[in-house]
Amino acid sequence: MRARWLMMAAALGVAACSGEGGDPDAGAPAQDTGVLADSGVDSGVDAGSPADAGSPDSGDVDDAGPSDTGVDAGLPPLGPVTIDLTSNRPPDLLSTMNLFRIVDGRFEYNDRVVPYDLSTPLFSDYASKARALYVPEGASIQYTESGALDLPVGSVLIKTFLFGEDLRLPQEELHPVETRLLVRYADEWRAFPYVWNKGGTDAVYFVRGEVRTLAFIDPRGVSRTAQYLIPQKNQCLECHERKDADDRRFTTPIGPQARQLNWDVDFGAGPENQLQHLADAGMLSGLPPLGQVPTAFPWASLATTGTTALAYEAVTEAARDYLDMNCAHCHRPDATQGMTSRLWLNYDNTDTFHLGYCKEPGSAGSASAGRQYDIVPGDAEASILVYRTETEVVGDMMPLLGRSVADDVAVGIVRGWVDGLPPESCGN
């Protein structure tokens, strides 16, 4: 068996939400104010070792790359991956599918389960994420230049969310909180959410969702308290649902785009391009020369460059890619919020009005905090988009789901982009 290992601080996986039309078991998320990384769910499995953290220097712990140590812990091999596409309900225990296990603070992935990292990741209250994808034997991903890569039936996208009490420490223990699976059925993508037990040894299928109060020190040394949302299954549609040209609804992954994977990470034998790695493994077809593949802004580079030293061109790229990954799943022409608000934040939108320049909001209401336009070029303070990106006021903050505290690094980037735009006098 080829085992793949990953430090817990690595950012691996993709958004995991469902194309199903609702789950009768999923109600409003419950409130849980228990201790950090206590799932409130116990599978009865004996507790094992917690996870180790990596370096969070960039201001967002979701930024490290995968690695493959080749370590053999002396455990029996994982059994074959088991994905039952005939059932609408997954196994009660995540371990039943044999996608991965956590040993001595590391992820061990099964054959044809490959960790990956996003160039510009989604921010989720500073949670670290372990991302991976599974492709069945004999099948391969089809390259697409824009949007998510086309994964074959039977594929699984895996994203595990992890937290620690002090995110400044390179070896701070991280604890798995939840794992979201996105499974490719013949007719749609379906989501299966799991919550980890107290010992971090297994995760239980859990569709109702809950809110946890988590106290931690962020990578900049700021003490924070997040109202961390483990979403219920039905909430997935709020981010992942789109409409096609015939107005039919469908669900799509968000993260694993070619432009987000076109950069080097360490799989254990030195830096490798992630797309090339998949192609060399026979798991990706149609890959053009890498020089022809678009590339998203390398968010991890901010750990060394910081934000103040960036040229304005780089600030613009970083801001547009951040908005694309964190906002454009809703704010785009083929998503419900984009259709309603007419604010399109996808990175390839070149229409400045629909990007928000001097555009009055369609439905912001009191969330505009007295501001009149989505973006006032040259004036971040007067721009609704900047306010909603940085505020922590419930009902005003954006995105609506997935964060309760501000991403200070991203706020600085977005502010710098708007302030640097050629000034316009909106309304005149």
Language model: regions and residue ranges:
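Cys/His-rich metal-chelating microdomains
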Residues: 20, 242, 333
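Extended surface/linker regions that mediate inter-domain or inter-protein docking
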Residues: 122-124, 128-138, 143-321
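Long, charged, low-complexity terminal extensions
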Residues: 83-86, 319-320, 324
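N-terminal pre-domain segments of enzymes
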Residues: 64, 69-133
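Sec-dependent bacterial lipoprotein signal peptides
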Residues: 1-15
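Residue-level detector of buried hydrophobic side-chain packing
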Residues: 17-18, 239, 323, 385, ...
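Electron-transfer interface patches adjacent to heme c in soluble/periplasmic c-type cytochromes
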Residues: 263-320, 328-335, 341-428
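Ser/Thr-rich, Pro/Gly/Ala-heavy low-complexity intrinsically disordered linkers and tails
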Residues: 14-78
